[in-house]
Curated annotation (Swiss-Prot):
The keyword Protein biosynthesis does not apply. The keyword Lipoprotein does not apply. The gene is atpD. It is a peripheral membrane protein. It comes from the Bacteria. Coiled coil: none annotated. GO terms for molecular function: ATP binding; ATP hydrolysis activity; proton-transporting ATP synthase activity, rotational mechanism. Pfam families: ATP-synt_ab, ATP-synt_ab_N, ATP-synt_VA_C. It catalyses: ATP + H2O + 4 H(+)(in) = ADP + phosphate + 5 H(+)(out). This is ATP synthase subunit beta. It is found in: Cell inner membrane. Transmembrane segments: none annotated. Keywords: ATP synthesis, ATP-binding, Cell inner membrane, Cell membrane, CF(1), Hydrogen ion transport, Ion transport, Membrane, Nucleotide-binding, Translocase, Transport.
């Protein structure tokens, strides 16, 4: 069948209206190709009289009325499977790493339905991260969804990189990294770090363990809106082969923001705080596809920017509903110099249940949170009256809470170049043992600075000898 042609009748920024013969209008989400140009347009609305409204997936510089456009008759398709490993691609699956074309023999549409209810497979298995605060108070589930929430500059990307370092390297499966509207520099750093660690095998790309899809800050909103779907499509194809996949998204907020820009360009009425009226539906459509089936699993870790540190903002609030574990990064904790700046009282996990993690882990985590909560309540009294006015048992709580707070810090492998101290991976059993000793009072004689930036509790004892 001959491909149908239309012509551009209006261009307003990234929004392009194209006129087709009335009886041959493209369907919503069909990809249109501009003649003599690599630019792709995606149909968003049918306006009637043969005119469709599209979003340009690329720069619309130089577009003018009258240019011819061809309807491909299908949604955007991208290469999937082994050919994507070790490669960096854009939203359309074109390589941007200057290492030759990507094999297109296996492709998939970026718009797909979520798996049916009877295909889903819930998981109770824990995923050890080697980061004490996460393993203790908000453990991750294999095949679960995790959100890293935080404002600007509290360490979302560094935490994400450490998780990739600890899980992706130890994890024998494959990873997909979607850079959605983030800094190009970070994407470049990530690629080189993966190459240095051997996760990307530059000699033999097929032996690599990660596929990367980037739609950076400087790209048009259409690219940033669809790049998460491109990454997800690659992850789904690996899952459907029966593999366990790690899917990293940095940053899911930029996906929402791109949706807001596209919505405004299409002339939709904004809803609360200027977000698109379809915010919940767009987020749901993406998140429902990130799931584990009886064939394979997708474990997803998503960084979520929190505008103005307000967790009630519609964008992070909508994301919360879809997650199994939430890791909340706090500016107050970062200000104390405690990294990772995870708030152990705000962070939650569905896995923190005695039937999943075991009675000992559950009790230790709750005792740690209880001690920190009591310290939080006493801080106002300490600020006004000082430590001397506290009851002896409260003084003990404060001393233990400060030790716990410092023991929750940990040197990261990916931050070695900044801190100069080697990174530490702490097994879950050691994490539980360490915190159990602190809450039981076995470390009451140690100075609190001995607990700062160490791995296991044994290192704290060693450090205490040097401090003394």
């Amino acid at each position: 069948m001959a491909q149908v042609q239309g012509k551009i009748v209006q261009c307003i920024g990234a929004v392009v209206d194209v006129e087709f013969p009335r009886d041959q209008m493209p369907k919503v989400y069909d990809a249109l190709k501009l003649e003599g140009s690599p630019l792709t347009l995606e149909v968003q609305q049918q306006l009637g009289d043969g005119v469709v409204r599209t979003i340009a997936l690329g720069s619309s510089d130089g577009l003018k009325r009258g240019l011819m456009v061809t309807n491909t008759g299908n949604p955007i398709t991208v290469p999937v499977g082994k050919a994507t490993l070790g490669r960096i691609m854009d939203v359309l699956g074109n390589p941007i790493d200057e290492r030759g074309p990507v094999d297109q023999s296996l492709t998939a549409s970026i718009h797909r339905k979520a798996p049916a209810y009877d295909e889903l497979s819930p998981s109770q298995e824990l995923l050890e991260t080697g980061i004490k605060v996460i393993d203790l108070v908000c453990p991750f589930a294999k095949g679960g969804k995790v959100g890293l929430f935080g404002g600007a500059g509290v360490g979302k990307t560094v935490n994400m990189m450490e998780l990739i370092n600890n899980i992706a390297k130890a994890h024998s499966g494959l990873s997909v990294f979607a850079g959605v509207g983030e800094r190009t520099r970070e994407g470049n750093d990530f690629y080189h770090e993966m190459a240095d660690s051997g996760v990307v095998n530059l000699e033999n790309l097929g032996e690599s363990k990660v596929a990367m899809v980037y739609g950076q800050m400087n790209e048009p909103p259409g690219n940033r809106l669809r790049v998460a779907l491109t990454g997800l499509t690659i992850a789904e194809s690996f899952r459907d082969e029966g593999r366990d996949v790690l899917f990293f998204v940095d940053n899911i907020y930029r996906y929402t923001l791109a949706g807001t820009e596209v919505s405004a360009l299409l002339g939709r009425m904004p809803s609360a705080v200027g977000y698109q009226p379809t915010l919940a539906e767009e987020m749901g459509r993406l998140q429902e596809r990130i799931t584990s089936t009886k064939v394979g699993s997708i474990t997803s870790i998503q960084a979520v920017y929190v505008p103005a540190d307000d967790l009630t903002d519609p964008s992070p609030a909508t994301t919360f509903a879809h997650l199994d574990s939430t890791v909340v990064l706090s500016r107050d904790i970062a200000a104390l110099g405690i990294y990772p700046a995870v708030d152990p009282l705000d962070s939650t996990s569905r896995q923190l249940d005695p039937q999943v993690v075991g009675e000992e882990h559950y009790q230790v985590a709750r005792q740690v949170q209880g001690t920190l909560q009591r310290y939080k309540e006493l801080r106002d009294i300490i600020a006004i009256l000082g430590m001397d006015e506290l009851a002896p048992e409260d003084k003990l709580v404060v001393a233990r809470a400060r030790k716990i707070q410092r023991f929750l810090s940990q040197p990261f492998h990916v931050a070695e170049v900044f801190t100069g101290s080697p990174g530490k991976y702490v097994p879950l059993s050691e994490t539980i043992r360490g915190f159990k000793m602190i809450v039981a009072g076995e470390c009451d004689h140690l100075p609190e600075q001995a607990f700062y930036m160490v791995g296991t509790i044994d290192e704290a004892f060693e450090k205490a000898k040097k401090v003394a």
